[in-house]
Amino acid sequence: MTDTHSIAQPFEAEVSPANNRHVTVGYASRYPDYSRIPAITLKGQWLEAAGFATGTAVDVKVMEGCIVLTAQPPAAEESELMQSLRQVCKLSARKQKQVQAFIGVIAGKQKVA
C-alpha cells in the first residue's frame, strides 16, 4: 500500500506547450576575417505579446545550456525641470550663476539690477 505522502499531485506547468518555441543556433559572419560565430535570432508577434516590444531593454542571463531573457521595465521619464537642471549642470560656473539669478528674479526674491 502506498503512503499518503508518496502520491503524486497533479500540477499545472508554468509554461504551456502552446507557448514553446523552437529555434536552431545558426551563425553570423564576423568582419574582417568572416569567421562564423554562433547566433540565435528571435522574431515574431509573440515577442511583443510576451512583453518584448521594439526598443525594450533586455537582461540576458547565461548558464550552461540555458539562456534566460527578461524584459526590463521602462525607465520613468524625467520631468522637464529635471532635464533642464541636468543641462544647467553642464554649463560654466558663470552661466550657472546667471541661471540662479534669473530663478531668484522669477521667484521674486531678487530685484532686477
UniProtKB/Swiss-Prot annotation:
UniProt cross-references to PROSITE patterns, sorted A to Z: SPOVT_ABRB
Signal peptide: none
Keywords for the protein's UniProt record, in alphabetical order: Cytoplasm, DNA-binding, Endonuclease, Hydrolase, Nuclease, RNA-binding, Toxin-antitoxin system
E.C. number(s) listed in UniProt: 3.1.-.-
Superkingdom in the source lineage: Bacteria
Compartments, record wording: Cytoplasm
Domain SpoVT-AbrB positions: 29-74
Name of the protein this chain belongs to: Toxic protein SymE
InterPro entries named among the record's database cross-references: SpoVT-AbrB_dom, Toxin_SymE-like, TypeI_TA_SymE
A GO molecular-function annotation: RNA endonuclease activity
GO biological process, one term: RNA metabolic process
Protein family: Belongs to the SymE family.
GO-annotated cellular components: bacterial nucleoid; cytoplasm
Pfam families: SymE_toxin
Induction: Repressed by LexA, induced by DNA damage. During the SOS response (at protein level when expressed as a fusion protein). The mRNA stability and translation is controlled by the small regulatory RNA symR, which probably blocks ribosome binding. Expression of the proteinaceous toxin (putative endonuclease) is controlled by antisense sRNA SymR.
Organism: Escherichia coli (strain K12)
Functional summary from the UniProt entry: Toxic component of a type I toxin-antitoxin (TA) system. Involved in the degradation and recycling of damaged RNA. It is itself a target for degradation by the ATP-dependent protease Lon.
Note: Overexpression of this protein is toxic for the cell, affecting colony-forming ability and protein synthesis.
Main localisation: cytoplasm
